[in-house]
Swiss-Prot record:
GO terms for molecular function: cobalamin binding; nucleotide binding; ribonucleoside-diphosphate reductase activity, thioredoxin disulfide as acceptor; ribonucleoside-triphosphate reductase (thioredoxin) activity. This is Adenosylcobalamin-dependent ribonucleoside-triphosphate reductase. It catalyses: a 2'-deoxyribonucleoside 5'-triphosphate + [thioredoxin]-disulfide + H2O = a ribonucleoside 5'-triphosphate + [thioredoxin]-dithiol. The lineage of its organism: Bacteria, Bacillati, Bacillota, Bacilli, Lactobacillales. The gene is rtpR. One of its GO terms (biological process) is DNA replication. Its EC number is 1.17.4.2. SUPFAM superfamilies: PFL-like glycyl radical enzymes. Monomer. Keywords: Allosteric enzyme, Cobalamin, Cobalt, Disulfide bond, DNA replication, Oxidoreductase, Redox-active center. Transmembrane segments: none annotated.
């Protein structure tokens, strides 16, 4: 393999001298605590210029033409492209996904082929492991096993991804009868540092257990793969097809699992110890044993996935993100979170949605659930399979392998397929002098290269090679349209009738300038993909564009999140920090208000006054003032003219608008591919992440801030390695992984 593409120090110095990053009010702080990796040789975490260099070099070197003796002309061309990308990302006119900001260009990326993708989807049905990095020793590669989709989910969650999974009736019906109840004993050596804590959650001392001819013993290696294989073995022993010897006793030895607080060298952070795994294994075994002689239900399968997600949360740089997709007439699935005990124990681990098609009409109970607790969400698989952008019309089977979606709902996915995201802030890019068509072309090429990663799972490799799906998103959409047009995209509504139900409806009227703007950019993305695909000799991407929810990444640039309206014209935004976080002294020195977090010990809540882009515009609207009808209409606009994948949106509604949910879901059934809704809470919760304030309060609080956090932090020189990242819900639905 040839020497890779690298960016020179001279070039980076020129960019730093000429380009100012468009940090939002929380931008640099959010970057430093979330995406700046530790540099052991320098005894500090990365600076922004170093992060962008790592990220861009990690991506540009995925171009497959670099594998074999590339010409000087090719290397020069790719170096120039890397320089354009560097300048774009450094200025925050666009960014790759948060996953890429954290992982791209690291040894972990080079070792772990799946590491650059945010989220995945898997169907919960027996599947073959195939030629994957993880294959249980007792299985042939082509042998179907009940454990496989659970192993896939567990593995991808531990790599930091989110996973959508389908427990629709068509999948669950393929799972055979549970043949055996398994006597599971989890053991830990009495000399282990984790012994006492492990016994408290159900393990026993190793010397207390006697192996016999009827038992299977497995000592887990201290690896991610070891955790996955232990769970796979446990699941598969319950089924005669994968337990031909009819063994009914399993001893899992967790003595080698590193203790709580030990360093995780690959993904980063510190270990949780074996305790969450012990609890997970015992709980999953109970779910399966309870169905011995019978069949698993969609709720059982979702419980297993949720228990896995609960265990994975126990790391300091991950939040387990799951979306459970069930059948729309499966009342047990729809109501599964009403069991408060199980909700508190593990069912919180997924957002739940139901699959519908455009002929579906049973929205009344769904709307009732949404008004009560914001669930279920809606995923229209019929639209996803047969439409790109809605304006381009019906295209039978254009995405025919689609079975579900990622946890945030912006990408329709086939079994084993991942999201592959890049985000453009069009207003910021334009202000920095960029031609938006070039920006979106660079974005498409960046995402295309990610599809050439060496994926760990066979199902993923095969579908990625076929689809080469990319998801080029725009964020700060409300900022851009309001600034460029002087008004919001929905200019009004006109009276009409539903063509099938003949119900009276209000049809949105869109600003035609906005239609032209997004249509031109969509075509620029498609053209860039066509050209690059031809150059690389690979399939064109099956779909290209999306709108992602963009919580953390939008904070970097200070933009509105995806298509969402700002939560308020003026806000107090709160971020929680571990008390030992070196950013805290700098924030206090600069005048930011801080107080002890009332929800979590050893945590400090810091308040940031924020003014939304366009707050003074008379046509500005916030999530607290914009109507539910306009939010639906805005999502429909983007699904019609911009996104050929889907549009992630959490529509917020006031109590007085709850009775509109059912009719609006029905009205947009031919347009919107996925959506979720939540009641608007304003700032009513104590220490709420976002609290709307008035202009006077904003100006008063802003005057209290007297310093630049980045400069003060540098002067204090107090960086710390492996800090715990305190969890916060950055996207409305809480579905996104932190990174």
């Amino acid at each position: 393999m040839s020497e890779g593409i690298s960016l020179s120090a001279e070039f980076i110095d020129r960019v730093k001298a000429s380009v100012k990053p468009h940090w939002g009010k929380l931008g640099w702080v959010t970057y430093k605590r979330t995406y700046a990796r530790w540099l052991p040789e320098k005894g500090r975490s990365e600076n922004w210029d170093e992060t962008v260099k790592r990220v861009v070099e990690g991506n540009i070197n995925l171009d497959p033409r670099l594998q074999d003796s590339p010409s000087l002309e090719l290397k020069q061309s790719l170096t120039e492209e890397a320089e354009r990308l560097y300048k774009l990302i450094y200025g925050l006119g666009a960014t790759p996904s948060g996953r890429n900001l954290w992982i791209s260009g690291t040894d972990y990326q080079r070792r772990t082929g799946d590491s650059l993708n945010n989220c995945w989807f898997v169907a919960i049905r027996p599947q073959k492991y195939g030629d994957s990095k993880i294959v249980p020793s007792y299985l042939g590669k082509q042998e179907k096993a009940v454990s496989m989709p659970f192993s896939f989910l567990f593995d991808e969650l531990m790599k930091g991804g989110g996973v959508g999974f389908s427990v629709a009736r068509s999948n669950i019906s393929q799972i055979p009868r549970v043949d055996f109840a398994i006597d599971l004993q989890v053991v830990v050596d009495e000399s282990s540092e984790s012994y006492d804590a492990s016994v408290k959650v159900g393990a026993v001392g190793k010397n207390e257990v006697v192996q016999d001819a009827d038992s299977i013993y497995y000592r887990l290696p201290d690896t991610r793969e070891g955790w996955v294989l232990a769970n796979a073995l446990l699941i598969d022993l319950h089924f005669a097809q994968t337990n031909p010897d009819r063994k009914q006793k399993l001893i899992l030895d967790l003595s080698d699992i590193r203790p709580y607080g030990a360093e995780i060298h690959g993904f980063g952070g510190t270990a949780s110890g074996p305790m969450p795994l012990i609890s997970m294994l015992l709980d999953i075994n109970e779910v399966l044993n309870n169905k011995a002689g019978g069949r698993l239900t969609s709720v059982d399968a979702a419980d297993i996935c949720n228990l896995i997600g609960k265990a994975v949360v126990a790391g300091n740089v991950r939040r387990s993100a799951e979306l459970a997709l069930g059948s729309n007439d499966d009342q047990d699935f729809i109501s599964m979170k009403q069991d408060q005990e199980k909700l508190m124990h593990h069912r919180w681990a997924s957002n739940n949605s139901v699959a519908v098609d455009s002929a579906f009409s049973g929205y009344q109970p769904i709307a009732a659930g949404i008004r009560e607790n914001g669930e279920p969400g809606i995923v229209n698989l019929d639209l996803s399979k047969n439409y790109g952008r809605i304006v381009d019309g019906y295209q039978a089977g254009i995405d025919g392998d689609v079975e579900g979606t990622n946890p945030c709902g912006e990408i329709s996915l086939a079994n084993g397929e991942p999201c592959n995201l890049f985000e453009v802030f069009p207003l910021i890019a334009e202000e920095q002098g960029w031609d938006l068509q070039e920006v979106f072309a660079l974005a498409a090429r960046y995402a295309k290269r990610v599809t050439f990663s060496p994926y760990d799972w066979e199902i993923s490799r095969e579908i990625i090679q076929k689809n080469r799906r990319i998801g080029i998103s725009m964020s700060g959409i409300q900022d851009w349209l309001l600034t460029r047009l002087g008004n919001r995209v929905v200019t009004g509504f006109k009276d009409d009738f539903d063509p099938e139900t003949h119900e009276a409806i209000k049809v949105p009227v869109y600003d035609k300038r906005a239609i032209k703007m997004v249509d031109q950019l969509y075509k620029a993305v498609v053209k860039a993909d066509q050209d690059y695909s031809k150059t690389l000799g690979c399939n064109e991407s099956i779909k290209h564009t999306t709108v992602k929810p963009s919580g953390t990444v939008a904070k970097l640039a200070g933009a509105s999140e995806g298509m969402h309206f700002h939560y308020g014209a003026y806000l107090i935004q709160r971020i929680r920090f571990q008390n030992s976080d070196p950013l805290l002294p700098a924030l206090k020195a600069c005048g930011y208000r801080t107080e002890a977090d009332i929800y979590t010990e050893n945590t400090t809540c810091v308040e940031f006054p924020v003014k939304a882009v366009g707050a003074d515009n008379p046509n500005f609207a916030s999530a607290g003032t914009v109507s539910i009808a306009e939010q639906f209409a805005t999502q429909a606009f983007l699904q019609t003219y911009w996104s050929d994948n889907a549009v992630s949106c959490t529509i917020t509604f006031q109590d007085s608008e709850g009775d509109q949910v059912e009719s609006l879901l029905r009205q947009y059934r031919f347009i919107i591919k996925s959506t979720s809704l939540l009641p608007y809470f304003g700032g009513s919760l104590q220490q709420a992440p976002k609290e709307p304030i008035d202009k006077e309060t904003y100006e008063k609080r802003s005057q209290e801030i007297t310093g630049n956090v980045e400069e003060v932090f540098s002067q204090l020189n107090s960086d710390v390695k492996d800090l715990e990242l305190v969890d916060q819900t950055d996207c409305e639905g809480g579905a996104c992984p932190i990174k």
